[in-house]
Amino acid sequence: MAAAPPFVSYATMSEAIVAIADWPVLYASLQTHKAHVQEYPGCQRLEVYVAVDDDGSMRLHCYTTWDTPEQLEVFVERGYTFERMLADVGVTGVERSLVMEKLF
């Protein structure tokens, strides 16, 4: 019996730490950002997870998932990424950004 090839998609993950005082403006910007990015060809989803750290700051994880590595590459090079959106609203604190393959 032949095995089916694995389903693979391609993803970015960005992590940022922001001040709680920045949250109201950032939340509205994230809603607009999500609507904008999900219109890009090949974007399956944009998800943001939030946790409040012990010092009261907020830790955000932003994930985008793409159909092909080419679509992800174009987004990272020229698209309106999470990092670019944060810079536009005057928020600093990007901790790391990764490009990954999503297996499940």
Region annotations inferred by a language model:
Residues 17-29:
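Short, surface-exposed ligand-recognition loops at beta-strand->loop->(often short) alpha-helix junctions
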Residues 5, 32, 36-44, 65-99:
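An amphipathic, aromatic/His-enriched active-site/gating alpha helix that lines ligand/cofactor pockets
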Residues 9-17, 47-78:
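Short, well-ordered beta-strand segments in beta-rich or mixed alpha/beta enzyme
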Residues 2-9:
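Extreme N-terminus of proteins, especially the signal/transit-peptide cleavage junction
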Residues 101-104:
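Short, low-order "capping/linker" segments at domain edges
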